[in-house]
Amino acid sequence: MKIKNAKDMDSSSIKLSATVYGKAGTGKTTLGATFPKPFFLDLNKGLLSIRGKNVDYVELYDSTWVEIQDTLDEAIKSPDHESIIIDSMGEVAEICMKHICQLNRRQKPEFADWDAFYQSMKSFIMKVRNSGKHSLCI
């Protein structure tokens, strides 16, 4: 067994991936702004805390599930950004469920809709995590 020292680790290929949950005003968005070359998908008008910083973002306040997916695909392809920040996953989940209900012509989700919701959210999160970029889901 070869003993290694942590100071010799090459971290250049390691991508940060995290989910942060907390009350409003606890610094989640500010944390996201510290990620390398971040790109924010802003779904809840919560970027006031990073106003004035050199951070790119797109407003997705009244977007559809398809628009969010398309924007994520563009962010993944962007050579100008090293990190994808989703703010907030709660909004993503609401829009996802709304989309599923619309597809099934329902006003409210029924038992059968929850599996589709789970699969859609899992796919979305895996796409973010496996994007080859740093990622933070708020």
Which sequence ranges carry the predicted segments?
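Conserved P-loop
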Residues: 2-95
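P-loop NTPase motor core
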Residues: 83, 88-138
